[in-house]
């Protein structure tokens, strides 16, 4: 039976993902830190941190993995109707910290939040370095929804989303997926299965297949947005794609 590995605080090496536990699914390692170098090394291998204030840093690589191929984005009739109403203005990388704080707010079905202050600070640093990005949904000048994640070459690793108004995060996500498809991204990592993500066309795949996509991404030419910047390359209409 695989044993849980405590990370060496002096390097950013992770154990093979094949050594991750089956129960809980994907728990791979404990400890380390949330430095940019360690986080980037983790995401390149499909590993992500997920823990709360009462726990040490926990690192995960679940099998199977929930993934959306951007070209497979599915939009239901209700979402298409909402998009055509142009109810939300969509922006990119204008209020990263506010989006994280929105995602960190307690939810009705949760006792607390896994987006701790340390996590906020770590991802804000990744945002400053050009790896972490936010997509914002606005209504009447108020931030009412959005999401954030990490982009490394041609894979976007989704982290969390929030909505204060019904449909806000869905419109933000749909526009992100549409833009990523046009930029030639290979995949959007959704981590673990939910009905919400499945409604967009995301599906589970074996971890080994997901890791093959990661390797293809790392070996490919950087996308336009990485070279020119996300804000400079973003070409969705102000009120989103009408689909």
Swiss-Prot record:
Q: Which UniProt keywords apply?
A: Acyltransferase, Cytoplasm, Transferase
* An example molecular function term from Gene Ontology annotations: leucyl-tRNA--protein transferase activity
The chain's disulfide connectivity reads none
Name the domain of life.
Bacteria
Q: What is its EC number?
A: 2.3.2.6
Its UniProt entry gives the catalysed reaction(s) as:
N-terminal L-lysyl-[protein] + L-leucyl-tRNA(Leu) = N-terminal L-leucyl-L-lysyl-[protein] + tRNA(Leu) + H(+); N-terminal L-arginyl-[protein] + L-leucyl-tRNA(Leu) = N-terminal L-leucyl-L-arginyl-[protein] + tRNA(Leu) + H(+); L-phenylalanyl-tRNA(Phe) + an N-terminal L-alpha-aminoacyl-[protein] = an N-terminal L-phenylalanyl-L-alpha-aminoacyl-[protein] + tRNA(Phe)
Compartment(s) of residence: Cytoplasm
Biological processes annotated in GO: protein catabolic process
Question: What is the annotated role of this protein in its UniProt record?
Answer: Functions in the N-end rule pathway of protein degradation where it conjugates Leu, Phe and, less efficiently, Met from aminoacyl-tRNAs to the N-termini of proteins containing an N-terminal arginine or lysine.
Q: What is this protein called?
A: Leucyl/phenylalanyl-tRNA--protein transferase
